Amino acid sequence: MRLNIAPAPWPGAPVVVLSAGLGGGGGYWLAQRAALEAQYQLVSYDHNGTGENAGPLPADYSMATMAQELLSALQAAGITRFALVGHALGALIGLQLALDRPEAVSALVLVNGWLTLSPHTRRCFLVRERLLHAGGAQAWVEAQPLFLYPAEWMAARLPRLEAEDALAISHFQGKENLLKRLQALKQADFSRRAAAIACPTLIVSAADDLLVPASCSRVLQAAIPGSQRVEMPWGGHACNVTDADTFNTILCDGLAAMLPVAREIR
């Protein structure tokens, strides 16, 4: 699996891996890169089956497989310890890694994630799957912003959304891959294991998230010992995009608290 590994700002700088949600694209974190790259070595990637890592996925694709794919790629690049910032599905990958390979994960930032899929989120995905089966990639892509962004934010950016739709359709991961990745997401359940997560953990949610209720993050915090939680009052499911300034402040402050480092003296 191909990774996008940025230069380290100094030798030995902490590594921060950025993992997107169901869309899978590493470009999802564009609004965070400038805020992080002076302090951390950033690693982003397109999830297997998407973008630069396109290709058919196995029938029994699972969250454990997604986590192992990422870990193997990082190890092949010489990265053995890292923090992970994950959004939704990416947060689940982080949870899986922290449980399966705790020695590798220095910290977690879980953005609009969950322990187990809520009935509300399951209903949202059922509606989206029906759209996919009835209208194909175009219907899936055109409906997606409704679950990601607040209405006023979308209304003020229609040309941008139309351009994003066209790009997403042209780079669509494929119906079969999408359904396999979605099935892995729906089957993931960390409710019995989350108490074993030992690394520092920051949980970020948005109060107006339509797809994943903010209450899921409250449940997540209660399940992970010593975890911290910040709830943004606005921003929707993609709050790191719609209110990047607020999100980046939360993210940078959280990482600084969890990954205290001394910059190399020059």
From Swiss-Prot:
It is an enzyme of class 3 (hydrolase). It comes from the Bacteria. Keywords: Hydrolase. InterPro entries: AB_hydrolase_1 (IPR000073), AB_hydrolase_fold (IPR029058), Carboxylesterase_BioH (IPR050228), Pyrimidine_utilisation_RutD (IPR019913). GO terms for molecular function: hydrolase activity, acting on carbon-nitrogen (but not peptide) bonds, in linear amides. Residues 14-238 form the AB hydrolase-1 domain. One of its GO terms (biological process) is nitrogen utilization. Its EC number is 3.5.1.-. It catalyses: carbamate + 2 H(+) = NH4(+) + CO2. The keyword Hydrolase applies. Gene3D superfamilies: alpha/beta hydrolase (3.40.50.1820). Involved in pyrimidine catabolism. May facilitate the hydrolysis of carbamate, a reaction that can also occur spontaneously. Belongs to the AB hydrolase superfamily. Hydrolase RutD family. This is Putative carbamate hydrolase RutD. The gene is rutD.
